Amino acid sequence: MSTVCHNCRHPEFLGVECAWPAPGCSATAAPRRRPVVSWLVRTVAAASLLVALLQFGQAGYIQAKAWLAQALIAQAWQKTLAGQTQVKPWPWADTWPVARLRVPSRGVELYVLAGSEGRSLAFGPGHVFGTAQPGAAGNSVIGGHRDTHFAFLQWVQAGETVEVEMPTGAVAVYRISDQRVVDKSDTGVMASPPDSHRLTLVTCYPFDALRAGGPLRYVVTAEEAGTPL
């Protein structure tokens, strides 16, 4: 409810002194703090927007770097197919392509790098040292980032095929048999059963996590589907 100040004829709320006293008004003006509150709101909003833009810019830079690197790695892979070995995609690189990975049903084509260290994974999926070479007998384990090259793993289904092109040009065909979430300490992911021809793709989980890393991994297992092409 509101009344009208009898002295200055400005509206006032019951129990609140007149905020716009006219000359001669007996009411005492109440301090106006609305501008301070508005300034705080604007400042917080601007800061939030700045943080969001910085995060978006960083994410865009990571995405651009990841896919630009794949274009350079593709050139190195062509030289590898021509008979060269350990062809670095750029002079200062400490890795090189060891396979080409394709998932026809998803339109995915990626070049796999030697090693699964963080520096390598920034540019492409990486083959884990100590496991079978991609396309060879045993269990070949390949890791990749959930928000760039291996983001597609969240959509693949059992029965889809994965093709691995080797440096010789031969292609091994695998069929996805299993998807599961494990703890990152689960070494069974790299186990190689006798007479196995397995491809294991690993990335961080969950896919929508705000921070990289974490204790969980998403594992896609594929078994050889037939004779290499």
Q: Across the structure, where does each feature detected by a protein language model lie?
A:
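Serine/threonine-rich, low-complexity intrinsically disordered segments
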Residues: 4-5, 30
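Juxtamembrane low-complexity tails/linkers enriched in Ser/Thr-Pro and polybasic
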Residues: 23-33
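Solvent-exposed, non-transmembrane regions of membrane-associated and secreted proteins
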Residues: 39-229
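Residues immediately within or flanking Cys/His clusters that coordinate Zn2+
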Residues: 2, 15, 198
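Cysteine-cluster motifs in flexible loop/terminal segments that predominantly coordinate metals
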Residues: 5-25
